[in-house]
Amino acid sequence: MPRRRVVGQRKILPDPKFKSELLAKFINVIMQDGKKSTAEKIIYKALDTASEKKGEDHLVILEAALDNVRPSVEVKSRRVGGSTYQVPCEVRPVRRNALAMRWLVEAARKRGEKSMALRLAGEMLDASENKGTAVKKREDVHRMAEANKAFAHYRW
């Protein structure tokens, strides 16, 4: 626990094209080595491709994809009397979004398409239809939490 004041969450500026804070956060997750303009190009191209294929609005596809990837529970390691238990815990809303975005990007990076924009578009389309690697990751995390439900009383 901090002895002084608790530091609040920083306000994030919405992205320039769609005026969405969620999209601005996603751009920051994609960004590598501080190259924000490159990350923006990748995201906007991916959203254009995805909305062209599905025929829906850009932000609707992104929101649907993130909804299907967001975890509601996860497991945390907790050491009790010499043995380590995987204790299921609820995930806070901010962390839910962060994990969903991170998993989407990781899954997209592992795909086989030519460019990152195409990989991301493919993964977002898959996730919006409740399939794909990112959704599988969420299901694995939920399965782990379900399997370790017996240790839920060790929560802190």
From Swiss-Prot:
GO MF annotation terms: rRNA binding; structural constituent of ribosome; tRNA binding
CDD domains: uS7_Bacteria
Keywords carried by this UniProt record: Ribonucleoprotein, Ribosomal protein, RNA-binding, rRNA-binding, tRNA-binding
PROSITE patterns: RIBOSOMAL_S7 (PS00052)
A Gene Ontology BP annotation from the UniProt entry: translation
A GO CC term assigned to this protein in UniProt: small ribosomal subunit
Pfam families, A to Z: Ribosomal_S7
Functional description taken from the UniProt entry: One of the primary rRNA binding proteins, it binds directly to 16S rRNA where it nucleates assembly of the head domain of the 30S subunit. Is located at the subunit interface close to the decoding center, probably blocks exit of the E-site tRNA.
Family: Belongs to the universal ribosomal protein uS7 family.
Subunit structure: Part of the 30S ribosomal subunit. Contacts proteins S9 and S11.
Protein name (record): Small ribosomal subunit protein uS7
Annotated organism of origin: Shewanella pealeana (strain ATCC 700345 / ANG-SQ1)
Gene: rpsG
